[in-house]
Amino acid sequence: MYDNIIFDLYGTLIDIHTDEEDIAVWKHMCEFYAQHGVKYNPAGLRSRYKRQIRRAEQAMAKKRFKFPEIQILEVFEQLTLKKDQTPSDCAELTVAAAQEFRKASTGYIRLYDGVTDMLEQLKQAGKKLYVLSNAQRVFTFPEVQSLGIEGYFKDISLSSDFGAMKPDAAFYQQLLDRNHINPNRSIMVGNDAVCDVLAAKQVGLHTCYVHSNISPVDDADRDIKADIIMDEVNVPEMCRLILEDADR
């Protein structure tokens, strides 16, 4: 029986399309920065952003985790800082810039059909719900709030907070330890065969794999060994299968 259901977010509960390469995004960000006294051209801003990402990744590679995660706010901090400023001087603008970028680069974001009803049913059945997602808090938390699902979860664990991402077992373990979760009575639900199935099994979790429109392309060639396997996103069926499997 499953007492705890751990969900991935994007591609599992949330359907999203983003495009950070679109030059229109960078034109928009140049206009945003210009309003705050920071001047860029679109190509130059995009190049500097990528350069700061690489630097952050190189710095994190020296950390203890096998799959480290950067903190995107530190990237936007470097883009936002003016001469003679300290990070605290531009903290609010850094957050605003990051969130403006996320909105500008998002083509659409929505819940898959039936997600709210599923979460409600699982709660009514006495299940404890959690999130474990490779995501940046400055982007994701406002999205979770705007989609109206924040209140269903006992804990929302995001990779940017911990400094490591799935498939790192340490990222899983910190959620289990903090919430005193028994993996034998818990299931991980996600759309990535490596991050959400193989990695979850390493820490003793049961698994539900759902193939979605943003699952990794090479998942189609993998021999996926999950307790529940879904070939497409069908949230009512997902809910039924989880509850059915939980009661065995």
Describe the function of each predicted region:
Residues H28, V75, F139, E143:
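Short, solvent-exposed amphipathic alpha-helices that sit
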Residues M1-I5, D15-D19, H36-A43, T116, ...:
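Asp-based, Mg2+/Mn2+-dependent phosphohydrolase catalytic module
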Residues I53-F67, K103-D113, Q202, H206:
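Short amphipathic alpha-helical segments at helix boundaries and their inter-helical linkers
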Residues E20-Y33:
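Basic, amphipathic juxtamembrane/active-site segments
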Residues K66-E74, A91, R102-Y130, F141, ...:
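Short, acidic loop-to-helix structural element flanking the phosphoryl-transfer center
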Residues D8:
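Short, acidic, Ser/Thr-enriched surface-loop or helix-capping motifs
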Residues C30, P42-Q99:
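A metal-dependent, Asp-based hydrolase signature
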